[in-house]
UniProtKB/Swiss-Prot annotation:
Endpoints of the signal sequence: none
Keywords assigned by UniProt, alphabetized: Glycoprotein, Membrane, Transmembrane, Transmembrane helix
Subcellular location: Membrane
One of the record's GO cellular component terms: membrane
Membrane-spanning residues: 46-68
Keyword Transcription belongs to the record: no
Membrane topology recorded in Swiss-Prot or TrEMBL: Single-pass membrane protein
Domain of life: Eukaryota
Protein name as catalogued: Protein sigN139
Glycosylation site list: N23, N34
Lineage of the species this protein comes from: Eukaryota, Amoebozoa, Evosea, Eumycetozoa, Dictyostelia
Source species of the chain: Dictyostelium discoideum (Social amoeba)
Length: 91
């Protein structure tokens, strides 16, 4: 129980630290003029959503690419095995 409690505390501390530094960096980016800071403050709540969508797209792309690579690799190995099995009795 105490181990789980300390782990959750560490996790919440880490999340809080990254969140505050993230907000600080985004506010610092829009510090130059009022228009850019207002645009950034408007889009600031949307940043986690954008990050989630881009992460999801990246993971789906990786899954598709991995599946295609595995399929091509599997087809190549299957063809090689079939050729070997087909020619071995004739030799």
């Amino acid at each position: 129980m105490t181990i789980l409690g300390s782990i959750s505390q560490i996790g919440s501390m880490k999340m809080g630290g990254s969140k505050s530094s993230f907000n600080g960096s985004s506010c610092g980016a829009g510090f130059g003029s009022n228009s850019s800071s207002s645009i950034i403050s408007f889009f600031n709540p949307l940043l986690p959503v954008v990050a989630f969508i881009s992460g999801t797209v990246t993971s789906i792309t990786g899954l598709v690419a991995g599946a295609l690579t595995g399929t091509v690799d599997g087809l190549g190995k299957g063809a090689n095995t079939g050729i070997l099995l087909g020619y071995t009795p004739n030799i």
